């Protein structure tokens, strides 16, 4: 919860009214009494973290959610929210942030380090960088891909000729290891440390099964991890 639900006051962000109304409507649509994890996704500067934490406290005390998680927080904000939740006995257990070989924001803003120090989980979403880390793009953008004829998205995810060269190098590395590029990207996340799980989006059962094979691939060596980081310029 956190993104725009309706026009007008309290239609976005982390206010008590927004978060409680958002979950109530979701539970009604799902036909459920509660959810296992309720995420707060989008912070707004005009809502204090204390108010958001109080709303999450109400939600868990009422039994509408068993646990809560934070998404798109940076390290500093996560640190503050951790203490707010701890003071209110809110079961905050997980963070959900964009993280991939190409996107290291959670390292730069200290979210990953803060989550580890507080012993909170980290779920990585967009692990394939909007489809860039797949065999499909090894030779360049193809029709029916997310990036095809979409300059806005290309700019947003950092796609360029230089990025394409990086993709080609990573693809070759994956092929030499006997795996797909997506498997390499997922394996890197899980082995890099501090990542609890990876959130993947697929269009078919075949894609899901292919990505799950990342769990069966041989572990990356330290030199291979260094090679991946060097290719990505990180």
Language-model segments: what does each one mean?
Residues 5-8, 38, 151-156:
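A short, mixed-charge helix-start or loop-turn motif at secondary-structure junctions
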Residues 3-20, 41-47:
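Active-site mouth loops of central-metabolism enzymes
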Residues 27-46:
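Active-site groove signature of glycoside hydrolases
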Residues 43-233:
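Beta/alpha (TIM)-barrel catalytic core signal, keyed to glycine-rich beta->alpha loops juxtaposed to Asp/Glu
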Residues 1-7, 96-99:
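A short, structured active-site edge motif that brings together acidic residues
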Residues 1-3, 34, 126, 202:
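Short, small-residue-rich loop/turn micro-motifs
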Residues 12-30, 78-82:
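Short, acidic/polar
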């Amino acid at each position: 919860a956190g993104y725009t639900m309706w026009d007008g006051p309290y239609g976005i962000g982390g206010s008590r009214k927004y978060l409680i109304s958002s979950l109530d409507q979701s539970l009604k649509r799902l036909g459920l009494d509660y959810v296992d994890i309720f995420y707060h996704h989008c912070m707004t500067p005009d809502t204090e973290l204390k108010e958001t934490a109080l709303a999450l406290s109400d939600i868990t005390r009422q039994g509408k959610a068993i646990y809560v998680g934070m998404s798109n927080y940076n390290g500093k904000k996560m640190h503050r929210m951790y203490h707010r939740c701890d003071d209110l006995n809110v079961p905050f257990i997980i963070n959900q942030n964009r993280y991939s070989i190409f996107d290291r924001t959670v390292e730069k803003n200290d979210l990953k380090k803060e989550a580890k120090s507080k012993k909170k989980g980290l779920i990585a979403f967009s692990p394939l960088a909007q489809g860039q880390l797949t065999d499909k793009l090894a030779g360049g953008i193809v029709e029916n891909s997310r990036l095809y004829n979409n300059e806005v998205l290309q700019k947003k995810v950092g796609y360029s000729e230089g990025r394409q060269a990086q993709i080609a190098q990573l693809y070759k590395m994956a092929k030499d290891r006997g795996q797909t590029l997506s498997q390499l990207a997922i394996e890197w996340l899980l082995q890099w440390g501090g990542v609890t799980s990876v959130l993947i989006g697929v269009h078919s059962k075949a894609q899901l099964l292919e990505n799950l094979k990342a769990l069966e691939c041989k572990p990356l060596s330290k030199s291979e991890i260094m090679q991946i980081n060097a290719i990505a310029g990180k």
